[in-house]
């Protein structure tokens, strides 16, 4: 591979970043995968697979490992950032001086900015300026299934129509990976953050032992909260019936591959927050997202009772069963009311 002809540079060599890099390379593209830990990258290069997260999926020959950030960013104008939301802004500030003049940025990070609750588009604009094309991909994607080539579909939104078309062409694979372009840049970002919160709640419900009826009710009312917040931010309500909304919500609320769901189940079974986090052993995005989504809802005056009760469990020490009973004990109302 020449130094500047890769189709994509992927920033973040965790399970999801690796899975996306494998998918791109499997499509026949030259892909550079960068990670912040040189030892980890050296191990990936030696093993030619991600033994820790995706041990059964060998790397295609067109997937290249790189520990030098400048070299990785010089390799392609297209940069795919796949890092936890709480380090997103730091990573963008780190890569900005090293990016090519023709660079374009897409992220698969799901969440909001830590502490402020800002959308990641606002973080990216602040860090990178107004000229660089931006895009986001989101949807129901477990890394193991994506890397294994099992059928998957996602949403893609961008500020730039040409960039959206190019990304769809790069990512889309008729055999296993469908990419739908969505014009709603705000909604596609927001869905990925709110679903993390609701997935914790679904896990709590199952951990308590409330059953399938309760889980389904929580998912449905969680979708209502997602749509309500989206409307306040100017998102298209139809987005939340697509891959980045309902699709991702159902996946993470119902399958134990979801760290957020497993975390919630442990809380529902009586484990404390730190103990559950330690047992998961990886970042539980929904833990921070709960605080951020709650902050965003308060800022826009949006009532989100499920999110509020999950916040009370995570940050105020409320018992999960007590939180569930608080929700069940709310005043009677019409299903389609705005509150």
Swiss-Prot record:
One of its GO terms (cellular component) is cytosol. Sn-glycerol 3-phosphate binds at residues 110, 139, 141, 195, 248, 258-260. This is Glycerol-3-phosphate dehydrogenase [NAD(P)+]. It is an enzyme of class 1 (oxidoreductase). Its main location: cytoplasm. GO terms for molecular function: glycerol-3-phosphate dehydrogenase [NAD(P)+] activity; NAD binding. SUPFAM superfamilies: 6-phosphogluconate dehydrogenase C-terminal domain-like, NAD(P)-binding Rossmann-fold domains. HAMAP family: NAD_Glyc3P_dehydrog (MF_00394). NADPH binds at residues 15-16, 36, 110, 143, 259, 283, 285. The gene is gpsA. It comes from Salmonella typhimurium (strain LT2 / SGSC1412 / ATCC 700720). Pathway: Membrane lipid metabolism; glycerophospholipid metabolism. Catalyzes the reduction of the glycolytic intermediate dihydroxyacetone phosphate (DHAP) to sn-glycerol 3-phosphate (G3P), the key precursor for phospholipid synthesis. Belongs to the NAD-dependent glycerol-3-phosphate dehydrogenase family. Keywords: Cytoplasm, Lipid biosynthesis, Lipid metabolism, NAD, NADP, Nucleotide-binding, Oxidoreductase, Phospholipid biosynthesis, Phospholipid metabolism. It catalyses: sn-glycerol 3-phosphate + NAD(+) = dihydroxyacetone phosphate + NADH + H(+); sn-glycerol 3-phosphate + NADP(+) = dihydroxyacetone phosphate + NADPH + H(+). Its EC number is 1.1.1.94. Disulfide bonds: none annotated. GO terms for biological process: carbohydrate metabolic process; glycerol-3-phosphate biosynthetic process; glycerol-3-phosphate catabolic process; glycerol-3-phosphate metabolic process; glycerophospholipid biosynthetic process. The active site is at 195 (proton acceptor). It is found in: Cytoplasm. InterPro entries: 6-PGluconate_DH-like_C_sf, 6PGD_dom2, G3P_DH_NAD-dep, G3P_DH_NAD-dep_C, G3P_DH_NAD-dep_N, NAD(P)-bd_dom_sf.
């Amino acid at each position: 591979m020449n130094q500047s002809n890769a189709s994509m540079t992927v920033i973040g060599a965790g399970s999801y970043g690796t899975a996306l890099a494998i998918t791109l390379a499997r499509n026949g593209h030259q892909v550079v995968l960068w990670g912040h830990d040189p030892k980890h990258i050296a191990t990936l290069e030696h093993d030619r697979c991600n033994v820790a997260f995706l041990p059964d999926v060998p790397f295609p020959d067109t997937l290249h490992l790189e520990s030098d950030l400048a070299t990785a960013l010089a390799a392609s104008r297209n940069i795919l950032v796949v890092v936890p939301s709480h380090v997103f802004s730091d990573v963008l500030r780190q890569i900005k001086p090293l990016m090519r003049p023709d660079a374009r940025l897409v992220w698969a990070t799901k969440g909001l900015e830590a502490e402020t609750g800002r959308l990641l588009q606002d973080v990216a604009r602040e860090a990178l300026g107004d000229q660089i094309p931006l895009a986001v991909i989101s949807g129901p994607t477990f890394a193991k299934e994506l890397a294994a080539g099992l059928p998957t579909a996602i949403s893609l939104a961008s500020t730039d129509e040409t960039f959206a078309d190019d990304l769809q062409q790069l990512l889309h694979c008729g055999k296993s990976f469908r990419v739908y372009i969505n014009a709603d840049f705000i909604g596609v970002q927001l869905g990925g953050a709110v679903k993390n919160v609701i997935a914790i709640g679904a896990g709590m419900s199952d951990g308590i032992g409330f059953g399938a009826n309760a889980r389904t009710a929580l998912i449905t009312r969680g979708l209502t909260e997602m749509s309500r917040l989206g409307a306040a931010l100017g998102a298209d309500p139809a987005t939340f019936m697509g891959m980045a909304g309902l699709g991702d919500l159902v996946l993470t609320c119902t399958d134990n591959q979801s760290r957020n769901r497993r975390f919630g189940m442990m809380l529902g079974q009586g484990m404390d927050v730190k103990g559950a986090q330690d047992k998961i052993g990886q970042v539980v995005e929904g833990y921070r997202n709960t605080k951020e989504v709650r902050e965003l809802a308060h800022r826009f005056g949006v009532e989100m009772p499920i999110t509020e009760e999950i916040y009370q469990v995570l940050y105020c020490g409320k018992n999960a069963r007590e939180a569930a009973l608080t929700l069940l004990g709310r005043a009677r109302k019409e299903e389609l009311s705005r509150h």
